[in-house]
Curated annotation (Swiss-Prot):
Part of the ESX-5 specialized secretion system, which is responsible for the secretion of EsxN and a number of PE_PGRS and PPE proteins, including PPE41. It comes from Mycobacterium tuberculosis (strain ATCC 25618 / H37Rv). The chain crosses the membrane at residues 9-29, 43-63. The keyword Transmembrane helix applies. It is found in: Cell inner membrane. It is a multi-pass membrane protein. The gene is eccE5. The keyword Transmembrane helix applies. Keywords: Cell inner membrane, Cell membrane, Membrane, Transmembrane, Transmembrane helix, Transport. This is ESX-5 secretion system protein EccE5. The lineage of its organism: Bacteria, Bacillati, Actinomycetota, Actinomycetes, Mycobacteriales. Signal peptide: none annotated. Part of the ESX-5 / type VII secretion system (T7SS), which is composed of cytosolic and membrane components. The ESX-5 membrane complex is composed of EccB5, EccC5, EccD5 and EccE5. Belongs to the EccE family.
Amino acid sequence: MKAQRSFGLALSWPRVTAVFLVDVLILAVASHCPDSWQADHHVAWWVGVGVAAVVTLLSVVSYHGITVISGLATWVRDWSADPGTTLGAGCTPAIDHQRRFGRDTVGVREYNGRLVSVIEVTCGESGPSGRHWHRKSPVPMLPVVAVADGLRQFDIHLDGIDIVSVLVRGGVDAAKASASLQEWEPQGWKSEERAGDRTVADRRRTWLVLRMNPQRNVAAVACRDSLASTLVAATERLVQDLDGQSCAARPVTADELTEVDSAVLADLEPTWSRPGWRHLKHFNGYATSFWVTPSDITSETLDELCLPDSPEVGTTVVTVRLTTRVGSPALSAWVRYHSDTRLPKEVAAGLNRLTGRQLAAVRASLPAPTHRPLLVIPSRNLRDHDELVLPVGQELEHATSSFVGQ
C-alpha cells in the first residue's frame, strides 16, 4: 500500500470561484476603511491582503484529502458537539416488514425520508432453514462485484451499499472486554489455553448496509405496497443473488439491527468519547480511522487491513462503500482500529489519516440513514474483471505465541 501525498491542492471551479469572490469582498472592505485606519502606509489595505491570502491558502490547500479550513471546521464542530447525540442520529428504532408474497422478514430503518436495511453474510456452515444451500468455494468469500450488481435492480436504484466487516482479535478475555459483542453467544468464545501453547481464534462478522432514497424510486414505489416494501424487495433479491455463491446471506430483522449498531461501534462508548484531530479518545482506549488509496483497494489489501501485525489492535472495522458514479459502480474503503494505546506508525504505513473526520468515519459505518454522505473520500471505478473478494469466515485461526515443548 502507498499513501497519497499529505498536502495537495483542491482547485475545482466552484471552489476557486467562491474563494475569488470572498477575496474580492475582503479587499473591497479593506479599501473602504476610514483614513484613520490606513495611517501613512495603507495599513488596513495590507491587512486585507494578508487576510485574503490566508483565506485562499486555507481554502485550496488540502491535507490528507480535505482542505485545511474544512478539516478545522469539521473538527471544531465534532469537538463541541455531544458524541452520543452525533453517533445516535439516524439510529432510530427499526420496524419489521414482510412483503405480501415475500418469504423473509426484513428490518427497515427510516430517518429524514431515507431508508436502510441490512444483510448479514456468513460462512454458511449451517445453511438457513428452508434453503437448499451449498457453497461453491471451499473458502467463504464475498464477491464485491456481485454486491455492486445490486445497486441497480430493474426499477430500483440504491444510493449505495456498504460492506462492513468487524473483526475482534484475541481470546476469551478480549471478547468479554468488548461490550458490543454480547450478542455473540458465549459458547463461541470458549477456548482451551495453556502456558506456552495458545491458539487464539479471531472472530469476524460481515454485513451489507443497503441505502435507498425513495425520491429517486418514485416509479418503483408506485408499483409496490409502500416505501418499506420497495427496499425489502431489493434486499431479498440481493440475498438470493449472494446466497450460495461462496457464502450465505440472510436479511437482518429489526431487533438485530440494534445489535449491529453495537457491533460496529465495538468498544466505543459514545458518551465517553472525545473527538481528536487524529483519533477518538474514549475510556477504553483509542479509535483511529484511515482511508485507503483507491488504487490499493485489492483483495490482498483488504485482508491485510483486517489482520494487522500489531498486538495493540483489538478490534478492526473495515468499510467498503459501493456507489454509482456516471452509470458505473465506484468503490472506496476506510478502516478503523481500536487499541488500548496510540497506534504505532507501522500500522498506519500506506494508509491516509482521516484528519478532523474521526467522528464522521465512525458514523459513516453505522447502519443509519443519512440525508447526504457523511464521509467523502477518493474512490475508483469497479471494473467488471475486478476479482475483488472479502473473507467472511467467523473464526480465523491466529497464532499469538510460540509453541513450547514440541
